[in-house]
Amino acid sequence: MAEVMESVSTAVVPNSSVDWQKRCIALETQLMRFRLQAGNIRHLLAERMQELEQRVIEADQRAESAEKQVHIMEEKLKSANMQPSETENSLYRSYQELSNQIQEKDLIVKRLEGQLEKQNLVRAQEAEIIEEKAAKIKDWVTFKLREMETENQQLKKANLKQTEQILMLQDKLQTLLERPMSPAVDTHLVPSSPLHPPSCPGTPPAQEDCWRLPGCRLNSSADSKRKITEGCDSAFHSASLLPMLQDKADSPKSSQDGVDATSTVKESAEGVEPSFGVMRDRAMGGASDRDHSSDELNSKFRSQCLRSSSSSSSSSSSAYETPGPGGFDTPTPTPKSPPPVSLSPPLTRLPLSCPFPLALPLGTSMTLPKVRTPLTPRDSIQLVKKHHSQPQPGLERLHQVNVSIDIGNCGSPSCHSLVPGSAPSHGLEETDIDEGTPESMEVVVEGSEITEAQPNDGDLLDGLTKELEMMDPEALKPPTPPLHRFPSWESRIYAVAKLGMRVSEACLGAKTIGRVSTQPQHSTTGPFTHLIYKNISVPVYSTLKGKATQISSVPLPDDDSGSEDDSSSLASLHTSTLGPDKKGSTPGSPRAVKRGVSTSSISSESDYAIPPDAYSLDSDCSEPEHKVQRTSSYSCESVGPETLEKTGYLLKMGSQVKAWKRRWFILRNGEILYYKSPSDVIRKPQGQMELNSSCHIARGEGAQTFQLITEKKTFYLAADSPNILEDWIRVLQNVLKVQASGPISMDKEVKPTARGWLTKVKHGHSKLVWCALIGKVFYYYRNQEDKFPLGQLRVREARVEEVDRSCDSDEDYEAGGRGFLSSHFTLVVHPKEQSPTYLLVGTKQEKDTWLYHLTVAAGSSASLRVGTEFEQLIGKLLDVDGVSDSALWKREVLCFSKEGLRYPLTTLPSEALQTEAIKLFKSCQLFINVLVESPSIDYHTSLAQNALQVCLTHPELQNEMYCQLIKQTNCRTPHNYALTQCWQLLSLCVALFLPQHHFLWYLRQYLQRNADPRTEVGKYAVYCQRSVERTLQNGEREAKPSRMEILSILLRNPYHHSLPFSIPVHFMNNTYEVVGFDGSTTVEEFLNTVNQRTGMRKPQISGFALFTDDPSGKDLEHCLQPANKICDVISKWEQALKELHPGKYEGTRTVRLTYKSRLCFRAQAKGETERERLLLAYQVNDEVLQGHFPVSKELALEVAALMAQVEYGDLDRAAMSPVGSPQPKTQQTLLQVLERFYPKRYKQECSVEQLRELGERLVATKWSVLRGCTASECVRIYLTVARKWPLFGAKLFNAKPLPPSSLDRTQVWLAVNEDGLSVLDYTMYPLVTYPYQSVITFGGCKEDFMLVVSLIKDQALGKKTVDKLLFAMAKPKILELTLLIASYINYWTSSLPGASNQTQSSTLGAQGDKKLWDIDSRHFPSMTYTTKGPTLL
């Protein structure tokens, strides 16, 4: 067929134009399309058919369900049609029940409405009755008031009569006193002063016996008791009616003052005359008309007083009887005293209980403190009951004068009435209900004896109470308290607090002075103490212009400087700001002018005169001082002539008593002479200082003190202004040939790049010197310990070369007998425009080291081939500015190599350090190549700590450490755990120290190249960059990393946290706050974070500080200064713990940080936050618990209940059993309360049963009353009670006075607060207080604490004496006490208006801009490296 088709196609091709092949292809294409369309149609049709089938199935299912529902409905319909009656019955029953309930409710409502109407009627009737009673009471009150007014008029008339009688009695008394006395009687009339009563030491025995009076009994005991009762009764009803009447016979103006005296006596005689009448009637045995009238007046007065609601006067006078010389009794009024003189807190302890004489001679006055008169007798009854039931008043009466008034005659025992004086205000005073009321009716015996009441006091009080109750039964009813008063329980707490600021008598009686358990013993110093306190170097401070300025960083020896007498005149600079001292200037003798001394020099003897530094003996120095430019650095190579002589005033620290003395100094011929004044220059000098080559100068703290250190002594000197100080230092440096000032060489933070002994040759002169290259300056010293250089050489842009001395013939030249040939190698340093200096070096290693570092300092390292190959490549990178595409980065020397190091990568000055560098590389390899796992974590910790400690001990290896770690991480493949651990070790390094000079630049460039937040290595590089900046900002660390820091780096990814470390900060209320920090965080930054989280103020305002516990576990705490770094503190703490427990280190125990109050300022109390008040209350409670706060047993229970309410809230009443004893759970809570809030000394001698009774008493009378009181209210009340102690907020230190101290005590307390330093006895009674205005010098003196104070001996003449006090204490406590006093003094100095001006005027005033708390930071953690050679691993 195909053949036929071909033949046909061939036959017709020429005759036809149709292309059948294309036609066929087109048809086949159409066929394919048709097939596709047919397939699609079949597919769509199948889908449609499936959809229709599905619908059919669903329709069938719905039909079936509909049929089922139809069947169900049909069945229901059939059942409903079959039972219609049952449904109707159930509905009918429900209807009946609801109807019955409605009827019952209606009946109840009607019954209640009836009862309501009855109640309304009863209320209306009661209201009418009440109105009638109120009207009757109003009428009765009106009637009584009229009656009282009438009686008052009558009493005024009676007062006029009594006034006349008193005047008559005064005339009689004057007549008796003017008569000549016998010697026996004359001893009774010795004039006395209220400040020195006969009970005080020094009173004649005859006079002291007359005070006592119990010795002579002339009347019967019954009569005496009657007289005492009546006298006390009248005095008690008018507690403020003290003997204040003016003796008219003594005054020439009696006629003019008669009206005033009459008006005064009118008010006062109401409470005075009743006792007169009764006492005269019983004493004389007869009665006159005047006596009968007195009795009638007495009875009326009693009835009037017992029914009145207010006293008729606030100030009155009382009279009493004294035995006259004739044997009969004569009523003697007390003359009125002049206005009372305010008594400031004494500097010496005065007896507070001093009974006054029965009769005062003419010309003497007696000043008594005033008290508030009780409003009603029932108030007096309750006061008597309350004060008689409370503990006896003791030594807590700190700033008050307690007076005992004897009322009676020779035949009666004394009746004592304690009248409190007005205490001075101490900050925020809280007003309470008992303010001004008599606190006790007992005698307070001062001294070391225990307070005991007189035998008859209880009987007198009981008799007085019963007598008042019998006279007026209504007096037992308590009056309604006014609305403005505190709640009863709060008033009770304040009342107890007024008598409870003391140690209870039971506790004092059981202990002697020598064994008081509340005083801590001297603590021994442990390893952590030595680390944190720089080996306990106690500084010495002096008060200059009101500011505590450090004059020495070490304790002073006993006899340090000077030879003149210490009793000479003192400088008054320390009182110029804090106190208004007398500033008189007395010109010198006129003869001084004739001797050639200028008038300006003589007039400068004034305290604040500028010394005549312009009057130098050098005639060239005639330029005025204010035109001379002052600089802080000096050079011997100056063009002008050097000033080698000077005169002027300086302040000099005394030798025995460390006080400032103003002396006239003359510097001439290489020695210093000093005199008392310029007029004494013709006399023998008071002292002399020889200046030689071994002398040097050391600046003190601030800008006004310096030390002149000679071979034998150290002289402490101060100037009146910073400019004068700079002039003296300049001249002294010229004399001592010192060419550089102290700041650069004395800066311990700047580490020398290279140092060692070299022979310096210049201008043909050679000298063996100790050299140090610091930065770009080359310094040379006499010896290694010298702090001031002999000279300096600026190396920057200098030409440094090695001199070829192979042809020299003096190879055997030896230098200084030091055993090495210094002529082997020679270096020349040729600065621009200066002559060259030659350095002779002994060994090749030293030569290479000095050549490299000098070349780097000169800035020409790239052009010369010095240093190792690694250092040369870094120099080349520095020249090309470290471009990232430079081929130098991939040089084999800078990249990772599997082979170990054979030589150090940096230039090191000795063979030992080179060996140490190789061992350091091996240690790093062990750390890097061993995988960090839990079992081997301590292994890696030890490796890292040892390696980094070697770098801290030898700073020369720090550059080497960084070069090795960068080499180990650069171009290292593959990226495994070894690379990560190498970056972790680098992360530990950058937080501790940084490389120097161009190595630091290389580190920064390397970190920048690798910083990439997308990779793990890049994240570590970013973290290291942040650490480098933080280390540059806050300075380098002092201790190796702690275990906690290393574990945080190894186990936690530090790059995920901005603060990779965290530690809990504990508070006094047993709570804590977890705070984060990094490797460079200081305590100040750390506390800012704590304050933000807890809502507290800055430490400079609140007075809070951070403390650490002691690793030994002893009850010791160490205060951290703001400049300390948290990581250093933790590391030193762990190091001390390892030393205390060698071989068994507990990794679980960590340092405990506590945030609590260190300084307390009354002025800052107003802005206290709730959190601060809460923490302060818990801190005071801790002091109460430890026995550092005086509380009685009663007050201890009160404050314990307050703290229990704060800690546990309301006491659960359901927990109390019906009998009244607590259940076991409550009993356990009470034991916890007593354990946490009740003083330990009161629990020591208590048995278990006594503790249980104490807990029941706490619940029944104290804690249960506080129900509903919030924690903030309890804290407020607690602090109000605590602030009633005048020394609230003071820090107490246990000390032992040493001779020549006047304190004859074995142990005392030293209390430091914002007012000054107080010395307390073992009962915390103040013996003496030294305000900061009187403090001259304080700090360490040998092994003890020294305090030098200036006291005013004679107030009238203004004479001052200087006392030096020594106290034996533990060294850490001496340092803490010294820094605490300095902080308080400088706080007040900074708050004064002129303080800022003084700081700004200083040429070195930058140091004064530091915060107050930073001033003593250098005494805290700082490692001192004393190792001479390398410390091998």
Swiss-Prot record:
Residue ranges of every copy of the PH domain listed in the record: 643-737, 751-859
UniProt-listed InterPro entries: Band_41_domain (IPR019749), FERM/acyl-CoA-bd_prot_sf (IPR014352), FERM_2 (IPR035963), FERM_central (IPR019748), FERM_domain (IPR000299), MyTH4_dom (IPR000857), MyTH4_dom_sf (IPR038185), PH-like_dom_sf (IPR011993)
A Pfam match: FERM_M
UniProt feature, compositional bias: Basic and acidic residues: 279-299
One Gene Ontology biological process: branching involved in blood vessel morphogenesis
Low complexity bias spans: 308-318, 568-578
Domain of life where this protein originates: Eukaryota
Keywords: Coiled coil, Developmental protein, Repeat
Bias-annotated ranges (Pro residues): 332-343
PROSITE patterns: FERM_3 (PS50057), MYTH4 (PS51016), PH_DOMAIN (PS50003)
Polar residues composition bias: residue spans: 252-266, 597-606
Domain (MyTH4) ranges: 896-1050
FERM domain span: 1061-1392
Biased composition regions of type Acidic residues, renumbered to the chain: 557-567
Transmembrane domains' residue ranges: none
Coiled coil: 40-174
Region ranges (Disordered): 247-346, 552-634
GO cellular component: cytoskeleton
Function: Critical component of the guidance pathway underlying endothelial cell migration and blood vessel patterning. Involved in mediating membrane localization of ephrin proteins, which have been shown to provide guidance cues for endothelial cell migration.
Record protein name field: Pleckstrin homology domain-containing family H member 1
